[in-house]
UniProtKB/Swiss-Prot annotation:
Its EC number is 2.7.4.25. SUPFAM superfamilies: P-loop containing nucleoside triphosphate hydrolases. It comes from Geobacillus thermodenitrificans (strain NG80-2). The lineage of its organism: Bacteria, Bacillati, Bacillota, Bacilli, Bacillales. The keyword Nucleotide-binding applies. Belongs to the cytidylate kinase family. Type 1 subfamily. The keyword Metal-binding does not apply. Its main location: cytoplasm. InterPro entries: Cytidylate_kin (IPR003136), Cytidylate_kinase_dom (IPR011994), P-loop_NTPase (IPR027417). GO terms for cellular component: cytosol. This is Cytidylate kinase.
Length: 224
């Protein structure tokens, strides 16, 4: 029987992590775990409940009362918060601009990481985020770090927003993505960085299929 491993895919906002991770998970019949969606789900709940996103204890208390479920479906992964389908709404501008502030709190990350590790027990998972290879799954058999230029990432996010029916301003997106990069890279707890043993792939001029093919080569080497 083929060994079921853990695959960690990290990188900055809009580097193509989720798209590629879903594709890899589908090809391997693995479970896809979008850790960013978990932080977005908590951020959505905080905004909904009027909880200060800079108040760590208030967020931790809210998280304790929040059920976050990731469910596969023919349309892709669905995200539920306390039974409510929030898959699309957590991709909106309000959540996008607030999520980095929520994700930088050490105690919030500690609880989220515990939940993420529990989901990965037994292997057979593809998990993407900012600190999977360095912090959440440091022993993952395959670690990938995706990067792309700010301009290309803004263009991708712009197209995603339009496809979802969200208003979108390309120049504003460039500024927001650069700002998120700074917050994610400079936070004290589990900052965005490439694991020493991760394979770095610049996706700026690559198609999703080309990136997926490269990752599958690495996975097959490790499984074999």
């Amino acid at each position: 029987m083929e060994r079921r491993i853990c695959i960690a895919i990290d990188g900055p906002a809009a580097a193509g992590k989720s798209t590629v991770a879903k594709l890899i998970a589908n090809r391997l019949s693995y479970v896809y775990i979008d850790t960013g969606a978990m932080y977005r789900a908590l951020t959505y709940r905080a905004l909904q409940c009027g909880v200060d996103i800079h108040d760590e204890q208030a967020l931790l208390s809210l998280l304790g009362d929040t059920s976050i479920e990731l469910k596969p479906s023919p349309q892709g992964q669905l995200v539920f918060v306390n039974g409510e389908d929030v898959t699309d709404i957590i991709r909106g501008e309000a959540v996008t601009n607030a999520v980095s502030f929520v994700a930088k709190h050490p105690l919030v990350r500690e609880e989220m990481v515990a939940r993420q590790r529990a989901l990965a027990e037994g292997g057979g998972v593809v998990m993407d985020g900012r600190d999977i290879g360095t912090n959440v799954l440091p022993n993952a058999e395959v670690k990938i770090f995706l990067k792309a230029s700010v301009e290309e990432r803004a263009r991708r996010r712009h197209e995603e927003n339009i496809a979802r029916g969200f208003p979108s301003d390309l120049e504003k997106l460039k500024e927001e993505i650069a700002h998120r990069d700074r917050i994610d890279s400079e936070r004290e707890t589990a900052p965005l960085r490439k694991a020493p043993d991760a394979v770095e792939i610049d996706t700026t001029s690559l198609t999703v299929e080309e990136v997926a093919a490269r990752i599958m080569e690495i996975v097959n080497e490790r499984i074999g």
